[in-house]
């Protein structure tokens, strides 16, 4: 269904170009499938001298998907998703063990001219979240609001505006209860394999600005290179290659140009799927 999408999709294309797949850790992911179709994914991540592990199992039956994740911190998160309850409607139930206050139920509805999401925490005094986007794929406006029913206070209220055409997506977001304004831009250069993007954020309370800009180029259908730079002087680069179907390795590096004598950070990620 073609429409404006849900609220988190405002500015997502620029965020993906600037931040997605960049990392300074070492990460290995292996996915296997059992004979009855259950997908099992094991992930190991090394951060400094610490190693974190996670194992995920996913079961799909028609329009129902069940995800169970367990990590090395002894947390178990279960998510049950039911697609197309009616055309355009999705329901999501999630809860974690041992966190008894983590339960949440969410409904998402996508239409040609609207995208609405409503969620409620499964507690005695839950937090209720409502986000909506109205418009078309070319021009849309949206809002995202959370209410703490225990105090009656709004814990979050954001607003966003998005404009897009065949090769350009621009967005404007008012975040942090109106304290920060973010403008983002994504552009495919001359309908080529190269895209550029930028994100500028202004904080009204501190009167500070942050700017990140970057580019992405598809060398061939299996290889992508990316680079970015921000106003704090940090430069990053990334090379990603799909060396076999669904199996990808990624190498990324970051250097602080204001402290060039310090060692740069290098991250490696390998994801294997049969």
From Swiss-Prot:
It is found in: Mitochondrion outer membrane. Induction: Not induced by osmotic stress. GO terms for cellular component: mitochondrial outer membrane; pore complex. Expressed in shoots and roots. Also expressed in callus, leaves, panicles, sheaths and stems. GO terms for molecular function: porin activity; voltage-gated monoatomic anion channel activity. InterPro entries: Porin_dom_sf, Porin_Euk, Porin_Euk/Tom40. Pfam families: Porin_3. The keyword Plastid does not apply. Keywords: Ion transport, Membrane, Mitochondrion, Mitochondrion outer membrane, Porin, Transmembrane, Transmembrane beta strand, Transport. Coiled coil: none annotated. Consists mainly of membrane-spanning sided beta-sheets. Forms a channel through the mitochondrial outer membrane that allows diffusion of small hydrophilic molecules. The channel adopts an open conformation at low or zero membrane potential and a closed conformation at potentials above 30-40 mV. The open state has a weak anion selectivity whereas the closed state is cation-selective. Belongs to the eukaryotic mitochondrial porin (TC 1.B.8.1) family. This is Mitochondrial outer membrane protein porin 1. It comes from Oryza sativa subsp. japonica (Rice). The gene is VDAC1.
């Amino acid at each position: 269904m073609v429409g404006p999408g849900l609220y988190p999709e405002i500015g997502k294309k620029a965020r993906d170009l600037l931040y997605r797949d960049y990392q300074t850790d070492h990460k290995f992911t292996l996915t296997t499938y059992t004979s009855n179709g259950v997908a099992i994914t094991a992930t190991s991540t090394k951060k400094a001298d610490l190693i974190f592990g996670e194992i995920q199992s996913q079961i799909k039956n028609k329009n129902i998907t069940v995800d169970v994740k367990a990590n090395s911190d002894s947390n178990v998160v279960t998510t049950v998703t039911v697609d197309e309850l009616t055309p355009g409607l999705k329901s999501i139930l999630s809860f974690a063990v041992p966190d008894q206050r983590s339960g949440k139920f969410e409904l998402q509805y996508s239409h040609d001219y609207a995208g609405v999401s409503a969620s409620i925490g499964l507690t005695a005094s839950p937090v209720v979240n409502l986000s909506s986007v109205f418009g078309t794929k070319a021009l849309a406006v949206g809002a995202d609001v959370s209410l703490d029913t225990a105090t009656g206070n709004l814990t979050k209220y954001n607003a966003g505006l998005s404009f897009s055409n065949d090769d350009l997506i621009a967005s404007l977001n008012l975040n942090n209860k109106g304290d920060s304004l973010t403008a983002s831009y994504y552009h495919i250069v001359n309908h080529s394999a190269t895209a550029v993007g930028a994100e500028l954020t202004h904080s009204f309370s501190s009167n500070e600005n942050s700017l990140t800009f970057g580019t992405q180029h598809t060398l061939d259908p299996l290889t992508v290179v990316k680079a970015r730079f921000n106003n704090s002087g940090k430069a990053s680069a990334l090379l990603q290659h799909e060396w076999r179907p669904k199996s990808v390795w990624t190498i990324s590096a970051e250097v602080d140009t204001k402290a060039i004598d310090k060692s740069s950070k290098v991250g490696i990620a390998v994801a294997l799927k049969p």
